[in-house]
């Protein structure tokens, strides 16, 4: 595929992500300026998205806004990922008990991906966008997911993740294996100052998988607050995990059509 086609595809998705952030109508000039696109490219992309039914154009005000077709692209995904809803309930339970940012993470090749997040209610907090990825070696959730693999697979992933990581953030295999041994012994992962300086994360494995993959239920926030509340936060995570255990007969959602 030509690089120009790749760039156009990326920009089309960036426009949709842009509307997710601003959540209001925008003119072509505002979109082009905010995303640093040439106006000619923005015009073509917007017209294409209109023709495909993903954007509405108000000719009187000369502004654009997404259509429900954008929502339809992914409205089926949460049910496929989270099944009967126990995972989402577990997230809400932890959020209610701690007020901290909560997320579910899964492996995506050599990366950790945050597939669902709930924002912290504390004044001092860190923001995390759903869909964000980072190398598995660069977060407590990633370490926890690595701990579910054989040592040979961990070796392979660490080497590949290091290739995708800046030199100053690469990890030595023996250091990673020591971390993973501790995680396997304790049954949970804790990380401080990684990936965010001054932040701390606490993670446990969910009993249910997401699309057949192990999933981590985590909370993250200011390190000092986490150190002061470590036991309470860990208890909240473990209680949520116990509540998320799903009987075998309920693993697969049943669709009933009338």
For each feature predicted by the language model, list its residue ranges.
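Short, highly charged C-terminal tails/helix-capping segments
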Residues: 250-258
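Amphipathic alpha-helical effector-binding/dimerization core
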Residues: 61, 65-160
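Signal-transmission/dimerization alpha-helices at domain junctions
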Residues: 147, 240-251
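Extended hydrophobic
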Residues: 169-243
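A structural signal for short hydrophobic beta-strand segments in well-ordered beta-sheet cores
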Residues: 55-57, 104-105, 206
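N-terminal helix-turn-helix
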Residues: 1-80, 242, 246-247
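Amphipathic alpha-helical regulatory segments at dimerization interfaces
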Residues: 34, 45, 86-97, 103, ...
């Amino acid at each position: 595929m030509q690089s120009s086609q790749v760039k156009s595809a990326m920009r089309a998705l960036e426009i949709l992500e842009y509307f997710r952030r601003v959540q209001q109508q925008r003119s072509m000039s505002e979109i082009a300026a905010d995303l640093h696109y040439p106006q000619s490219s923005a015009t073509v992309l917007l017209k294409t998205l209109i023709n495909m039914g993903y954007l509405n154009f108000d000719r009187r005000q000369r502004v654009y806004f997404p259509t429900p077709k954008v929502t339809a692209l992914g409205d089926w995904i949460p049910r496929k990922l989270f099944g009967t809803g126990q995972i989402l309930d577990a997230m809400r339970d932890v959020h209610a008990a701690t007020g901290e940012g909560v997320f579910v993470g899964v492996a995506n090749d050599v990366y950790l991906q945050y597939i669902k997040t709930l924002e912290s209610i504390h004044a001092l907090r860190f923001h995390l966008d759903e869909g964000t990825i980072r190398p598995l070696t660069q977060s407590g959730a990633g370490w926890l997911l690595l701990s579910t693999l054989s040592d040979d697979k961990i070796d392979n992933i660490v080497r590949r993740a290091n290739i995708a990581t800046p030199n100053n953030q690469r990890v030595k295999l023996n250091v990673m294996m020591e971390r993973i041994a501790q995680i396997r012994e304790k049954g949970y992962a804790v990380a401080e100052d990684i990936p965010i300086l001054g932040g701390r994360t606490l993670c446990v494995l969910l009993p249910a998988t997401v699309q057949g993959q192990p999933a981590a239920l985590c909370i993250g926030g200011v390190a000092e607050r986490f150190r002061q509340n470590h036991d309470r936060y860990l208890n909240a995570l473990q209680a949520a995990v116990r509540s998320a255990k799903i009987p075998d007969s309920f693993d697969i959602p049943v669709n009933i059509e009338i």
